Amino acid sequence: MNQERIYKVLLGPVVSEKSAAVGEASNQVVFKVLADASKVEIKAAVQALFNTKVESVRVLNVKGKTKRTRYGVGKRSDWKKAYVRLEQGQEIDFAVAE
C-alpha cells in the first residue's frame, strides 16, 4: 500500500455514545473509512498514522437513511465504519495525532 493511500483511508473518528462506551470498555476506536477500504488497509493506516499496535479490525457498511423533504424523498449516502481494537496498553490521543 502506498503512502498516499494511507492518508486517504481514514476519514475521521466516529463520535457517538456507542463509540465512547465501546472505547472505554474494550480498548476500541471507531473510524469512518473509505467505502472500498479493506481491513488490511485500515490496520496499516492506523498503525502508521498513530504509532500504535492494532489487534483486530471489524468493519460494517452503514446504509444511508431515507429522508423526506418538501421537494420529495431523498437518501443520505452509504458509508463504512471500522471498529479498531488496539493491543493492551495502547491508546490513541486525537489531540496529539500527527
From Swiss-Prot:
Disulfide bonds: none annotated. InterPro entries: Nucleotide-bd_a/b_plait_sf, Ribosomal_uL23-like, Ribosomal_uL23/eL15/eS24_sf. It holds the Pfam family Ribosomal_L23. This is Large ribosomal subunit protein uL23. Keywords: Ribonucleoprotein, Ribosomal protein, RNA-binding, rRNA-binding. GO terms for cellular component: ribonucleoprotein complex; ribosome. One of its GO terms (molecular function) is rRNA binding. It comes from the Bacteria. HAMAP family: Ribosomal_uL23_B (MF_01369_B). One of its GO terms (biological process) is translation. One of the early assembly proteins it binds 23S rRNA. One of the proteins that surrounds the polypeptide exit tunnel on the outside of the ribosome. Forms the main docking site for trigger factor binding to the ribosome.
